[in-house]
């Protein structure tokens, strides 16, 4: 079992409340959305992985926001391409 102290993660984020929000968002990305961990998993749960990523400075609120914006852009581009393909199929 990995021993994670949150003091290092709190120092990276600034305060414990924001750290909790960032850790929860990142853990959800790993567990539910299938995002790849940026550190070795070592059979840890997503929450522990998220805390380790925060401790190492790999994840913060800004990186999560940027990743989310990129995901939205990619999803919108895929939707536009699908609509364009449907429209081309109907116009023939």
UniProtKB/Swiss-Prot annotation:
GO CC, alphabetical: DNA-directed RNA polymerase complex
Enzyme Commission number(s) of this protein: 2.7.7.6
Catalytic activities: RNA(n) + a ribonucleoside 5'-triphosphate = RNA(n+1) + diphosphate
Domain of life: Bacteria
SUPFAM superfamilies: RPB6/omega subunit-like
Gene3D superfamilies for the chain: 3.90.940.10
Top-level EC class: transferase
Keyword tags: DNA-directed RNA polymerase, Nucleotidyltransferase, Transcription, Transferase
Molecular function GO labels: DNA binding; DNA-directed RNA polymerase activity
GO biological process: DNA-templated transcription
Its biological purpose: Promotes RNA polymerase assembly. Latches the N- and C-terminal regions of the beta' subunit thereby facilitating its interaction with the beta and alpha subunits.
PANTHER family named in the record: DNA-DIRECTED RNA POLYMERASE SUBUNIT OMEGA
Subunit annotation: The RNAP catalytic core consists of 2 alpha, 1 beta, 1 beta' and 1 omega subunit. When a sigma factor is associated with the core the holoenzyme is formed, which can initiate transcription.
Family recorded in the similarity comment: Belongs to the RNA polymerase subunit omega family.
NCBIfam families in alphabetical order: rpoZ (TIGR00690)
Protein name: DNA-directed RNA polymerase subunit omega
Species for this entry: Shewanella sp. (strain ANA-3)
């Amino acid at each position: 079992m990995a021993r994670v102290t949150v003091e290092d993660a709190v120092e990276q984020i600034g305060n414990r409340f924001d750290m909790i929000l960032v850790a929860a968002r990142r853990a959800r990305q790993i567990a539910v959305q299938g995002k790849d961990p940026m550190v070795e998993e070592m059979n840890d749960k997503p929450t522990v992985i998220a805390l380790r990523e925060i401790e190492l400075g790999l994840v913060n609120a800004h990186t999560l926001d940027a990743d989310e914006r990129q995901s939205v852009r990619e999803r919108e581009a895929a939707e536009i391409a699908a609509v364009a393909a449907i429209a081309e199929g109907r116009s023939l």
